[in-house]
């Protein structure tokens, strides 16, 4: 299965009539492996900050997490495995696997829990596959 298929069929899937605003699978260096049509472009320093937060949980909490210049307030995640952010009526979930970052961005009416479920389910599957 291609990385694009994972994005199109597993991340951008419909859940209770809603779907993510955008999604992507990236390498730990920020290289895009696959993305939805309107996924924002991460800046290199944003990826560096995100990877540092996975290594040093809480690193982004004082400043917030930036994605394509948009600031997200970091909310409780799973140290070293999942970072979650909130911005207005939407937010972001990033799941780290051995080789990739699985990213989902949502807006209302999708809920944070629905975004978490979609992103983390695929991330957990990739971890099980050694990815």
UniProtKB/Swiss-Prot annotation:
Its main location: cytoplasm. It comes from the Eukaryota. Disulfide bonds join 13-115. The modification Phosphothreonine is found at residue 111. GO terms for cellular component: cell cortex; cytoskeleton. Keywords: Actin-binding, Allergen, Cytoplasm, Cytoskeleton, Disulfide bond, Phosphoprotein. The variability of the residues taking part of IgE-binding epitopes might be responsible of the difference in cross-reactivity among olive pollen cultivars, and between distantly related pollen species, leading to a variable range of allergy reactions among atopic patients. PANTHER family: PROFILIN (PTHR11604:SF31). Occurs in many kinds of cells as a complex with monomeric actin in a 1:1 ratio. Binds to actin and affects the structure of the cytoskeleton. At high concentrations, profilin prevents the polymerization of actin, whereas it enhances it at low concentrations. By binding to PIP2, it inhibits the formation of IP3 and DG. This is Profilin-1. The lineage of its organism: Eukaryota, Viridiplantae, Streptophyta, Embryophyta, Tracheophyta.
């Amino acid at each position: 299965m291609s990385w694009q298929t994972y994005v199109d069929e597993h991340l951008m899937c419909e859940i209770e009539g809603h779907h993510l605003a955008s999604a992507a699978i990236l390498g730990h260096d920020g290289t895009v492996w696959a993305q939805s049509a309107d996924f924002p472009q991460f800046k290199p320093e944003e990826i560096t900050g995100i990877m540092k937060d996975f290594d040093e949980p809480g690193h982004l909490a004082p400043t917030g997490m930036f994605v394509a210049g948009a600031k997200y307030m970091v909310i409780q995640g799973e140290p070293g495995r999942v970072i979650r952010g909130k911005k207005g009526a939407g937010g972001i979930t990033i799941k780290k696997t051995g080789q990739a970052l699985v990213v989902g961005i949502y807006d209302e009416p999708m809920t944070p829990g629905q975004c978490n479920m979609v992103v983390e389910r695929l991330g957990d599957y990739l971890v099980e596959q050694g990815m």
